[in-house]
């Protein structure tokens, strides 16, 4: 099906591995298959691997740069934003073994403004963190994932995905419009002065017909706050259905 979508206007295949928002982890076999298509069609395959350490299964992350057969077609994107919780730093990189492509990228980079000095200094310090730091981070996110999934599964009518990686869940709600419910949470509902902000999932789909009853939830807060968020969502759903 992917091959059928590729036309003379297609320049690249772009994926995120693990995926935002689904948390899907592409296997080595799938990455190799995508590389094969990129080589056959003479296009690039661009893979955002910013979440590559955030894996919750026994499978390991397979980088697009590992396959030499696609070395002239593969581009890997990385950033300090997720790994070190530096979302505002806007410090990242693109890596490719295609020397001509990298030369063109460097020419373009000279025409753009550079990141703030403080962001660069913070990033330099962050990447020096020992392996034990990331190990602790992954353990914490694994616990958070398990906590929020368990809490949401207790809510009647709610279905939640179990992500293989990254730190997002796609949550199906018992509502016709997740966007309307998300707005309701922010404008018309509170529980003891608190509410929850959700991201409607419809915007992540290429088809307007999909994801209307889904939201993306990021488990980036400590477990106690995630439990509280699930409690608020449950109470809000009860009020929303009766309004």
Model-identified regions with their sequence ranges:
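PLP-dependent class I/II
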Residues: 1-243
């Amino acid at each position: 099906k992917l091959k059928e979508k590729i036309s003379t206007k297609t320049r690249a295949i772009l994926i995120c591995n693990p995926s935002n928002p689904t948390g899907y982890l592409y296997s080595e076999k799938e990455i190799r298959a995508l590389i094969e298509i990129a080589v056959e069609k003479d296009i690039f395959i661009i893979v955002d691997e910013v979440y590559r350490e955030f894996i919750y299964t026994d499978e390991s992350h397979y980088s697009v740069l590992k396959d030499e057969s696609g070395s002239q077609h593969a581009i890997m994107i990385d950033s300090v934003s997720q790994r070190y919780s530096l979302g505002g730093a806007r410090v990242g990189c693109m890596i490719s073994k295609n020397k001509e492509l990298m030369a063109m990228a460097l020419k373009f980079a000279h025409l753009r403004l550079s990141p703030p000095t403080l962001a660069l200094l913070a990033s330099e310090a962050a990447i020096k963190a020992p392996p034990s730091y990331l190990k602790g981070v992954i353990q914490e996110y694994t616990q958070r994932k398990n906590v929020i999934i368990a809490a949401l599964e207790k809510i009647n009518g709610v279905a939640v995905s179990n992500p293989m990686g990254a730190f997002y869940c796609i949550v199906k709600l018992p509502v016709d419009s997740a966007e309307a419910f998300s707005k309701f949470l922010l404008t018309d509902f509170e529980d003891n002065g608190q509410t929850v902000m959700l991201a409607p999932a419809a915007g992540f789909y290429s088809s307007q017909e999909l994801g209307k009853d889904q939201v993306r939830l990021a488990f980036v807060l400590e477990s106690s706050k995630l439990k509280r968020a699930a409690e608020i969502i449950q109470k809000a759903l009860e009020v929303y259905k009766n309004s």
